[in-house]
Swiss-Prot record:
Entry-linked SUPFAM superfamilies: Zn2/Cys6 DNA-binding domain
Region (Disordered): 1-28, 117-152
Name recorded for this polypeptide: Arabinolytic transcriptional activator araR
Subcellular localization(s) per the UniProt record: Nucleus
Knockout mutant characteristics: Impairs growth on L-arabinose, but only a small growth reduction on L-arabitol.
Organism: Emericella nidulans (strain FGSC A4 / ATCC 38163 / CBS 112.46 / NRRL 194 / M139)
GO biological process: one example: arabinose catabolic process
Xref: Pfam families: Fungal_trans, Zn_clus
Feature: compositional bias, Polar residues: 1-17
Disulfide bonds: none
């Protein structure tokens, strides 16, 4: 047994502990007597009790671990240990001790922890124990005691201390590719392994034999800078320093993902928004992947491990398509471990779950779902937003086809929760109706779960209780902020559905017909300043008694650009894009396409889309004229973000710059929609030209739009050189706007004019900027194709047949034909 050392300067007797001779340089040996704190963080200890790291962190420096021999533990000894554990659990002592150290009052030493649990435990108990750190030989200690709680020194940099540890040992944190996930299983699963269906329980179930859990609380008693993070801290505090978590949350609200949520509610210290741990984890994950995360004091390898940890944690907390709270998972984890022991006959699983009473084994879907136990609870709005975060991250990677399973989950859950309908607030909250958001029933220390909030009724959308609740202060009623958050989430999904349909050549999932009763999103200035009213111009819609005829909301469909936000200028364009997608799907239909081509009904539809584009172009001109003088809109803009904006001259310049950026992007998108309306979407069919479309008047009309689109891209590069304003949406638009220029250069070769070649050069520069900001394979491939075509047109000697064959092979990867899948390889 190891002796305890409470910072009194005594250390275990060992040959490796002797001081080095001053005349000879001592050979460094494996440090087997690191203090508990350094051992837990996997950092080098100077072996001076108290050590320098503990002194800097103001924590107790002690050595209480059992020192045992290296090598595997005999199976007979494992079975004996499990048997002894079962016997001790049957006769619990009033106060347990561990290695001579009495257990803290009010805490309970867990009898046994399921090896099949993941992320500390499958069901975090009320005291949230954490898994003990691996010992020197790579295994977790058999009886690791409670680890000292780190307290950051006043004025010190906790992030620097944490990063110093990870620099010394890349496996400092077992969740960041550390060795604590078992022998023979390799490192922690990569991000795409999780998305491809890897069960995280396998990584935890394969941990070293005889693994235990300590009784150390994973949360500190210090107040949080952002109390909204309280539900998440038990899961991340043992791995990520608080300062880094706070910085990531701040960074999230400067990203493009935060448009559908209210930053003030999340960052409030008095009344933070009740949020699920999965949503909070996904927000940190989004921020960690943002390019601006490099401004944080973390190295790229550390950033990668942080992203992997937050990825797996988000999936673990989200429980996709199940959405079962953790409070019922203790028995379920024991049942899984018992089944694993029976199936594998592994002594390491012996006795798992024996100390749990039979009543703790609940069905995972108990209290929700159908009577056969096949369908789980619906989920909540937070789950939908979490799906959006996960799906967006995958869409921006090379795994684009895999992202659709997450997008479909978001679409389905949003429709199941009826986010496309104005909700009615029921006066009594005794029972929840079907489709409402369940409360967050996570059992975490110091957090009894978020307030289940109001109860919604979707049965009759014409009731008077649809009216604005801006004058109500009752906590049991839904707030206008939450109603607006639901609307913005639905419209964001609406935008993404059109974007994905254009990217992957698939039909629409969210229809215009099911969106027409929902109010359009509030303008950005009112949303950021918290001036929210549900005041519909329609008599059967929500009415605001306080606003009367003021603050009237916009109705769907709307084809007018009215502000700088993605909902203000991009949503009308995506509404028009949806009609183009319907037209293209009908054109490619095996039967309808032949019947409708050239018919009057088809021409009427094309004329209607042209009318909508003209309405948007006129509104864009008005928007540019009204925002050129920043006096009127500037006051509202400054009121919305007065705490985050610079002085007045800088504010005016930033506002004008933002306006020009929006106008440049919107102008380009209008030209691309013109090309998509009368042109061809598939690059191979465009180049082959089997139907002689290049000889038609439609081709001549699209050339001018292609050149004007290149001019708009030149303006975009002036105001947004790195294409960071809307990188997730712009890539496919840039690709479709470049196909026609590629065709012209391919046909004319050296006869192409300088104007055409300059337009191609602009498109190449924009594509290169996209590659830097959001690196994807299709952009790299198209850049090479476009660059070779321009070089050939400028006189580079090449083998024409060979280079044309290579271009066609690359373009054939991305087809928008009847069977094509677009960018989804």
């Amino acid at each position: 047994m190891a002796s305890s050392h409470q910072g009194n300067g005594t250390v275990p007797n060992s040959q490796t502990d002797a001081p080095p001779d001053s005349s000879t340089k001592r050979r460094w040996r494996r440090n087997r007597i690191a203090c508990d704190s350094c051992h837990a963080r996997r950092v080098r200890c100077d072996r001076q009790f108290p050590c320098s790291r503990c002194l800097r962190s103001e924590i107790t420096c002690e050595f209480t671990r059992e020192r045992r021999k290296r090598g595997r533990i005999a199976r007979s000894k494992l079975a004996e240990m499990a048997k002894n554990k079962m016997e001790t659990s049957e006769t619990p002592a009033p106060a347990k001790t561990m290695n001579g150290i009495p257990a803290p009052a009010g805490t309970e030493i867990p009898g046994h922890v399921s090896p099949a649990s993941t992320f500390h435990h499958r069901s975090p108990p009320a005291n949230a124990p954490t898994v003990s750190a691996p010992s020197v030989d790579g295994r977790r200690s058999q009886t690791d005691p409670q680890l000292p709680v780190r307290r950051p020194e006043i004025g010190g940099n906790v992030t620097e201390e944490w990063l110093a540890g990870t620099h010394v040992s890349p496996g400092s944190y077992e969740f960041l590719n550390g060795p604590a996930f078992g022998e023979g299983l390799g490192p922690f699963p990569h991000m795409f392994d999780v998305w491809n269906g890897v069960d995280l329980a396998a990584y935890s179930a394969g941990t070293s034999q005889g693994s235990k859990a300590t009784n150390a609380p994973s949360t500190s008693t210090a107040p949080l800078k952002y109390p909204v993070l309280q539900p998440l801290m038990p899961f991340v505090e043992a791995t990520l320093p608080r300062k880094l978590v706070f910085d990531l949350l701040d960074l999230y609200f400067t990203s493009a993902f935060s448009t559908h949520m209210h930053p003030v509610s999340f960052l409030s210290k008095d009344a933070p928004r009740p949020s699920s741990p999965a949503l909070l984890s996904s927000m940190l994950w989004v921020a960690a992947l943002d390019d601006r995360a490099f401004s944080l004091p973390i190295s790229p390898p550390q950033r990668k491990r942080i992203c992997q940890f937050l990825c797996a944690l988000t999936i673990r907390l989200l429980r996709p398509l199940i959405h079962v709270s953790f409070k019922d998972q203790g028995g379920a984890a024991a049942a899984v471990a018992a089944a694993a022991a029976a199936a594998t006959n592994n002594p390491a699983f012996a006795g798992v779950g024996q100390d749990l009473p039979p009543t703790t084994v609940h069905h995972p879907f108990e209290g929700g779902g159908d009577d056969r136990g096949l369908v789980g609870p619906a989920g909540s709005l937070d789950d939908v937003i979490t799906y959006i975060h996960v799906a967006s991250i995958i869409s921006s990677s090379e795994q684009k086809a895999a992202s659709m399973r997450w997008w479909h989950a978001a679409f389905t859950l949003a429709r199941e929760l009826k986010l496309n309908q104005e909700i009615e607030v029921m006066p009594n909250g005794d029972s929840q109706v079907e489709g409402s958001s369940p409360p967050f029933g996570y059992s975490l220390p110091g957090w009894d779960g978020a307030d289940p909030g109001p109860v919604f009724n979707y049965s009759n959308p014409t009731r008077s209780s649809l009216n604005c609740v801006c004058d109500r202060q009752d906590q049991n009623t839904i707030t206008e902020e939450h109603r607006e958050e639901r609307r913005r989430t639905w419209w964001l999904l609406y935008i993404m559905d059109r974007h994905l349909a254009l990217c992957y050549n698939r039909p629409l999932a969210l229809l215009d017909a099911e969106s027409e009763d929902l109010l359009l999103p509030l303008d950005e200035a009112s949303w950021q300043s918290g001036i929210i009213h549900s005041n519909s111009p329609k008599s059967d819609g929500p009415q605001c008694l306080l606003s009367a005829d003021k603050n009237k909301r916009r109705l769907f469909p709307n084809f007018i650009c009215h502000d700088h936000s993605v909902f203000g200028f991009f949503l009308p364009l995506m509404t028009i894009t949806g009609e183009l997608i319907d037209l293209n799907q009908a054109r490619n239909h095996p039967m309808l396409g032949m019947r409708l081509n050239g018919k009057d009904a088809w021409n009427v539809h094309v004329s209607e889309v042209l009318r909508q584009l003209e309405i948007y172009k006129a509104s864009l001109t008005t928007f540019a004229a009204t925002t050129s003088d920043p006096e009127a809109p500037l006051s509202a803009y400054a009121h919305a973000q007065s705490e985050h904006l610079p002085a007045e001259p800088s504010l005016s310049q930033a506002y004008a710059w933002h306006t020009q950026t929006v106008i440049s992007y919107a102008s380009y998108l209008v030209h691309v929609l013109h090309i998509l309306l009368v042109g061809k979407w598939d690059p191979v069919s465009l180049i082959e030209d089997k139907d002689f479309w290049t000889s038609s008047p439609a081709f001549a009309s699209t050339i001018s739009h292609a050149l004007d689109a290149a001019d708009s891209v030149d303006q975009i590069l002036r105001y947004d050189p790195d294409i960071s304003f809307m990188p997730y949406f712009f890539g496919i638009q840039l690709l479709q706007g470049s196909f026609l220029l590629l065709l012209i250069v391919e046909r004319l070769q050296k006869e192409a004019g300088e104007g055409i070649l300059n337009a191609c050069e602009v498109m190449i520069r924009a594509t290169e900027s996209c590659v830097v900001t959001l690196n994807t394979e299709y952009q790299r491939n198209f850049r090479q194709v476009m660059r070779s075509a321009v070089a050939q047109a400028r006189g580079r000697p090449v083998n024409h047949s060979e280079i044309r064959h290579r271009r066609k092979a690359v373009l054939a990867l991305y087809r928008w034909t009847r069977k094509g899948t677009g960018l989804a390889l």
